[in-house]
Structure formats: structure tokens, C-alpha cells
Regions:
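Flexible, gly/pro- and Lys/Arg-enriched active-site loops
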Residues: 46-53, 68-71, 75-159
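Nucleotide and nucleotide-moiety/phosphate-recognizing core
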Residues: 2-7, 13-97, 107
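Short glycine- and Lys/Arg-enriched binding-loop motifs that mark or flank ligand-binding interfaces
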Residues: 4-6, 10, 127, 141
Length: 159
């Protein structure tokens, strides 16, 4: 397998853990070998109000797919598992069965109309960084140069 990819997963509807596990299984079948998987974390919604908490996790995958192919495949998996939309027309977030974010593709920095790498908000989200630190504490943000552990410590110090 050629490239190491980090993905963040979250669900706040239905049987959350089962849905996240099913997404991870499908990723393993279609994107590449799942090398590491974090624990599941119960977190509050970010960027909007909801009574539904999230189940979040992170995984690392070794893949031969291109970044765009990874993105297309995880979006296809989201649709297969019942996710319809992640935002309202006004841009506000909504509850969802599954959300899969491509966080990092082997340290690639990319900014196209369909994909920005690394994920532009990952370093601002505790629910992303906590599971990422569990599986890859020494991962280095390709733009900021800080490790996952340093980024998470910074988020915790902001609070």
C-alpha cells in the first residue's frame, strides 16, 4: 500500500457505534487496510445545537487510491449508510447518520474546488484531535508543523 491516510468519523443518529463500525468495515474493503482505529468518543455537536451527542473515532488507512478517489469513496459510503446532507441551505450543520472526513493524505497539502488537505478545521476540533492523538500522537500537521499531541494540548489550553 502506498499512502497513509487519516480519516475522522462521526455519527449522532441511530445506533451510532454500529454505524461507525460499519463505515470502518466498508473503508477497509474499498479504500485500503485499516492500520489503526481509535476508541469511540462521546462528544457534543460542534457548530450547531442538537440534543443528539456524537460518537467520534479516527482511523489510519494505507491506500493506493488518489486523494480524490478516497474522498469519492468515503462520500459514497456515507450515502450507502443513509447520510443525506451535512448542512442546511444556510450553511448550518445538521444531525447525521455518518460523517467521514479525510483529515490527511500522507502529508499532502492540497487546495482544489473539491478537496482541501489537510482538513482545514481539524486542528480546531477536539473531537477530531482526541481520537487522532490516540492512534497517531506524533503525526505532524503538514502546514502548521505541530504534532497531533501539541495541537490537542493547544485546544485544551484554550478552554
Amino acid at each position: 500500500m502506498g499512502k497513509r491516510v487519516y480519516l475522522g468519523l462521526g455519527s449522532n443518529l441511530g445506533n451510532k457505534e454500529r454505524i461507525v463500525r460499519k463505515a470502518i468495515d466498508k473503508i477497509g474493503e474499498r479504500v485500503g487496510a485499516v492500520v489503526a482505529m481509535s476508541s469511540f468518543y462521546k462528544t457534543a455537536p460542534w457548530g450547531y445545537q442538537s440534543v443528539h451527542t456524537f460518537c467520534n473515532a479516527a482511523i489510519s488507512v494505507d491506500t493506493d487510491l488518489s486523494p480524490e478517489e478516497v474522498l469519492f469513496t468515503v462520500q459514497e459510503i456515507e450515502r450507502e449508510l443513509g447520510s443525506k446532507k451535512h448542512r442546511e441551505r444556510d450553511g448550518s450543520y445538521v444531525d447525521r447518520l455518518i460523517d467521514i472526513d479525510l483529515l490527511d493524505y500522507d502529508g499532502l497539502v492540497l487546495d482544489t474546488h473539491s478537496l482541501v488537505l489537510p482538513h482545514p478545521y481539524m486542528h480546531k476540533r477536539t473531537f477530531v484531535m482526541t481520537p487522532l492523538v490516540e492512534i497517531a500522537p506524533q503525526w505532524v500537521h503538514p502546514v502548521g508543523g505541530k504534532t497531533a499531541t501539541e495541537l490537542l494540548e493547544g485546544l485544551r489550553n484554550e478552554k
